[in-house]
Each structure stands twice: as C-alpha cells, then as structure tokens.
C-alpha cells in the first residue's frame, strides 16, 4: 500500500521519510537525500532512454518504482559505487503476472508452438480439469505461465462441449451442406426427398396465393374496370339503350336489315333534360336538335363511322357482335354492367333471347366482374325498348298521327341495306358540306307539323330506301358520294305512308316536289327551323 501511494506521486518518495521507507540503516541529511534523489532520476531516465526495451516503452515510472522497491541494488547504483553505470533492470519482467501493481500492461496474445499444443492436448486427454499443481508443472515444462495454461484448459473444455453437442468435427463442411437430424445423424434419402417435395409445394402454394391476390386487386381496381375512361351515368339515368362504340368500321352484321330498321326507327333525339352519354354521338348533334336537318357529319371523318357510332342501332350491333363471337369493345355498356349476375348463361343464347324479346342488351355476356352497385335499376326496371321510341310518341300525339313501328315486329327482310351514310342521323351533305334541305322537303311530317322536334321514324326508313333508288342514277350529290346503289326496294310491311315512286318524282335531287310538302318549302341551302 505504501509503495502504491508513492508511485502515484513519484516526487514525493524523495522526501525526508525515504530512509524509513527503503530501510536505509544510516541517518541521511538533506544533502544526501537530494543527491540520492538525483541519482535515482538519472537512472530512471537512462532506463527510459533505451529505445526498444519494455521499460523504455512503458515509461520510467515503473523503473523508478522497481529501484525503490528493491533495496539491494540501491546503494551501488544510486551512489555510483560500482562505477559500471548500468541502468536498472526489472528482475521479474519476464513474468507478466508478477508485475508491479501500479503499472497496467496490456497482455499480448500467447502464440503456442506445435510442441506446446501437443503436450497440452495430452494433458487434456488425461484430465479435463487439472489442479493447480499439474498446471504449475505444465507451465514449468512448457516454459509458460500458469495463468496461460489455465486459460487454455478453459477454452479447450468449451470447444469440447460444443463438439459434443453438435457432433461437428473440425474438418466438417458447412452445417447446411449435408442435412442432418437434430442429434447430428445423417438423414435418410427418402426423408430428404419428402422434405424437398414439401418445400416445393409450399413455395408453389405461396406463389399461387400471390397470383390470386394480384389478379383480384387488378380486377377490383378502377384501371382494370374501365379500359377507356370512367364509367358513365347511364346505369343511374336509365339510358341503357345507348352504348358507345369506338371509332372503327362496323362489322357486316350491323349492316343487315334488322340493324337498318332499328337504326331508322330509333332516330328520335333524347329528351331535352337528359345530358348526352359520354362518347356516344357527335357533340354537334345536340345543338342542332332545333333544326330538322339533324347532325352535320364531321368533315374529316367518313359518314359511315358517324352512322355506326350514334343511335340505339349501335347497341343492337354490339349485341350481334357479341353473339358472333367478336371481342367486346365498350367497357361500360349494359352488357358489362350486368355481366357478373349470379346465373351465368351462354353469350349466344343470351343474345338470341335479347333480340327476340326486343332488348338492346344481353344480361349474361361474359366480361370482367363488377361490384353489385347500381344494378338494382336494371333488375327492378328493365328497359324493354330503346330510349328513342319514347320521344316520337310524346311529340307526335297531336301531329301527323303516325305511330312508330312496334319493336316486337320482325324486321323486314325485303328492305335492302341502305348505305351507311343514309342510315345515320345526319342530313345528306350537299356539295359544299352543308346539309341538304331536300332531305327535309321530302318528309311530309317535318314540314306539316313544325312543332315536332323530329320526323317520324317510318318515313325516314322509306325515304332512305327511296333515296337509295334515286342514287342509282348518279345525279344526286349526296347519294352518289355515300356508296354504291343497292337494288330497288320492295313494298314494306310496316305501317306508314306509301313511299313515293320514282315515276312521281323528278330524277334530280335539287328540284322540290309539287305535292310533297303541305307548307311553303324553304329556299335551297337553308335549314328548316323547328322551333
């Protein structure tokens, strides 16, 4: 304890009590004490000046402490009696366990030689827990410190326990290269194959579950439901007869007699209070409702595309296209809205039943499943006819008295298919692209009843067939540009006025007929104002 305190204050050891501490036999005066202290410091500095000794690396305090603790070499070295001038050397510096308690030296890792390891292994095989006497004997024989022998035995016992628990030899490969049981025994090949099969099945089930989840998320997402745009409000407003079509030429099934009759009979406009369905018809159709000329065809678009994309006849064309097996084009038509109702029927039988019942939609056509929101309108209030049939009945109750042809009547097979431009809503375009007023002049109801917003459907069809016969002459501007002339028409079985014969009409389209209009005919090139 005393020398520890002296090491903490190295200059305090050279005070007046130095003689008592060292055990010096003679009383020392102040002069001798200072002289002794000077020699002690010089010797410590000399010991520290040796560049590669342990004491020089650790500082001179340990050397000074060792010289103070060891009283035997004190007088010859301190007083210079020996005259050799050799610095002090720690007597037990080779033993790290016997170092002075004040100096904390870091222990380096002990490198055992092969011979030392062999002897230690032999001793370990004899006894895993050697006593202190056996450890001391090993340390003396192997030129080691007893503490290092003790630590080696501790580490060797831990390694042995680990090897016994896992049966893992020193040269064994990685733990997962050869499958073993929990006790370390090798597994049977059948068990290995069974485990591999279970792992593959588990991975396959996980992959299938992930695929199903991604498909369900894709079908219920808004991007998976509507391919072109957001769903329209036709399901809420009841306008199920109007199904939008993309701008592509109609298939041959849409140009049949039934499609022509339905398109001609449904030419009445929608009610004024109902907004147009998005993407259904040309936007110019709605401002021109007040004129009897109808919509103007688009300048850069063929007239048959306008005819195919407007009117309830397009819905029948869509049903026929679905019955023919063609891909469904419209994502928010009535077929797609009503597709995933619980009874799933075949598409062909649905289309035939819908055509026979006069429906413009087939409720069971297959498409992407939709949620059940908004279906109650169609299930509770089925639409039995296109929306265009309701308007002529309300508008012509005091007019010409012509009732439209019933929807349930079979289509007339004798009526030839008119060119697509004549089956459209629009007027026949004149030479300058303006609507021709001869179309309005040939319709008796359009001039006789100015209050009606649109002419009756039946004269439209008869007029179209009559115009088709005149178009064969080649001198009518609009019929000549529309398409080739069809064969001459047969008498129509549907109710309506008798179509004017070619003998009663002049061959040219520009001259008005004498008795066709009840009122004065407007001049050429002007639209008829129906307001």
UniProtKB/Swiss-Prot annotation:
DNA-binding region per Swiss-Prot/TrEMBL record: 105-164
Coiled coil (residue ranges): none
Pro residues biased stretches: 244-254, 269-278, 407-420, 484-503
Location of region: Disordered: 87-107, 161-312, 324-344, 401-531
InterPro entries cross-referenced by the UniProt entry: HD, Homeobox_CS, Homeodomain-like_sf
Composition bias type Basic residues, residue spans: 202-220
Compartments, record wording: Nucleus
Biased segments, Basic and acidic residues type: 191-201
Major localization listed first in the record, in broad terms: nucleus
Biological process per Gene Ontology, one example term: cartilage condensation
Nucleus found in the keyword field: yes
Keywords attached to this entry: Developmental protein, Differentiation, DNA-binding, Homeobox, Neurogenesis, Nucleus, Transcription, Transcription regulation
Stored PROSITE patterns: HOMEOBOX_1, HOMEOBOX_2
Any GO CC annotation of this UniProt entry: chromatin
SUPFAM superfamilies in the cross-refs: Homeodomain-like
GO molecular function terms noted in the UniProt entry: DNA-binding transcription factor activity, RNA polymerase II-specific; sequence-specific double-stranded DNA binding
Annotated Low complexity bias: 224-236, 255-268, 421-438, 504-519
Source species, domain of life: Eukaryota
PANTHER family: HOMEOBOX PROTEIN UNC-4 HOMOLOG
Family as reported in the entry's similarity comment: Belongs to the paired homeobox family. Unc-4 subfamily.
Known function: Transcription factor involved in somitogenesis and neurogenesis. Required for the maintenance and differentiation of particular elements of the axial skeleton. May act upstream of PAX9. Plays a role in controlling the development of connections of hypothalamic neurons to pituitary elements, allowing central neurons to reach the peripheral blood circulation and to deliver hormones for control of peripheral functions.
Entry protein name: Homeobox protein unc-4 homolog
């Amino acid at each position: 304890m005393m020398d520890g305190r002296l090491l903490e204050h190295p200059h305090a050891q050279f005070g007046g009590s130095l003689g008592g501490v060292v055990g010096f036999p003679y009383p020392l005066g102040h002069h001798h004490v200072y002289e002794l202290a000077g020699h002690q410091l010089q010797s410590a500095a000399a010991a520290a000046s040796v560049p590669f000794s342990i004491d020089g690396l650790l500082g001179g305090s340990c050397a000074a402490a060792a010289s103070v603790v060891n009283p035997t070499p004190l007088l010859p070295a301190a007083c210079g009696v020996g005259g050799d001038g050799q610095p002090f050397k720690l007597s037990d510096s080779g033993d790290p366990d016997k170092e002075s308690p004040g100096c904390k030296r870091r222990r380096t890792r002990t490198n055992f030689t092969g011979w030392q390891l062999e002897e230690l292994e032999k001793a370990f095989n004899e006894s895993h827990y050697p006593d202190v006497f056996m450890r001391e004997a090993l340390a003396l024989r192997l030129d080691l410190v007893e503490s290092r022998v003790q630590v080696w035995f501790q580490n060797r016992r831990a390694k042995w326990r680990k090897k016994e628990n896992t049966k893992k030899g020193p040269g064994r490969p990685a733990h997962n290269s050869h499958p073993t049981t929990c006790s370390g025994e090798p597994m049977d090949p059948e068990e290995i194959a069974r485990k591999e099969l279970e792992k593959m099945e588990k991975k396959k089930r996980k992959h299938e579950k992930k695929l199903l989840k991604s498909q369900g998320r894709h079908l219920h997402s808004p991007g998976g439901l509507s391919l072109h745009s957001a769903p329209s409000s036709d399901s809420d407003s009841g306008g199920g007869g109007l199904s939008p079509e993309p701008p592509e030429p109609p298939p041959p099934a849409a140009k049949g007699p039934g499609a022509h009759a339905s398109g001609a009979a449904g030419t009445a406009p929608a009610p004024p209070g109902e907004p147009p369905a998005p993407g259904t018809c040309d936007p110019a159709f709605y401002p021109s409702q007040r004129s009897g000329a109808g919509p103007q065809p688009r300048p850069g678009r063929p007239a048959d595309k306008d005819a195919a994309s407007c009117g309830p006849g397009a819905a029948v064309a869509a049903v026929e296209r679905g019955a023919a097996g063609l891909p469904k084009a419209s994502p928010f038509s009535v077929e797609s809205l009503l597709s995933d109702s619980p009874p799933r029927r075949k598409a062909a039988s649905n289309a035939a039943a819908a055509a026979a019942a006069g429906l413009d939609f087939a409720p069971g056509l297959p498409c992407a499943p939709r949620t059940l929101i908004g279906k109650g309108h169609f299930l509770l209030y089925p639409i039995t006819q296109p929306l265009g049939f309701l308007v002529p009945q309300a508008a012509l109750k005091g007019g010409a008295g012509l009732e439209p042809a019933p929807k349930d009547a079979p289509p007339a097979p004798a009526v030839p298919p008119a060119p697509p431009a004549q089956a459209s809503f629009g007027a026949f375009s004149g030479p300058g692209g303006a609507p021709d007023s001869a179309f309005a002049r040939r319709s008796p109801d359009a001039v006789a009843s100015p209050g009606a917003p649109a002419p009756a459907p039946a004269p439209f069809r008869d007029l179209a067939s009559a115009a088709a016969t005149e178009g064969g002459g080649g001198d009518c501007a609009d019929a000549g540009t529309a398409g080739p002339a069809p064969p001459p028409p047969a008498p129509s079985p549907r109710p309506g006025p008798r179509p004017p014969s070619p003998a009663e009409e002049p061959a040219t389209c520009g001259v008005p007929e004498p008795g066709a209009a009840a009122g004065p005919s407007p001049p050429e090139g002007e639209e008829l104002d129906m307001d």
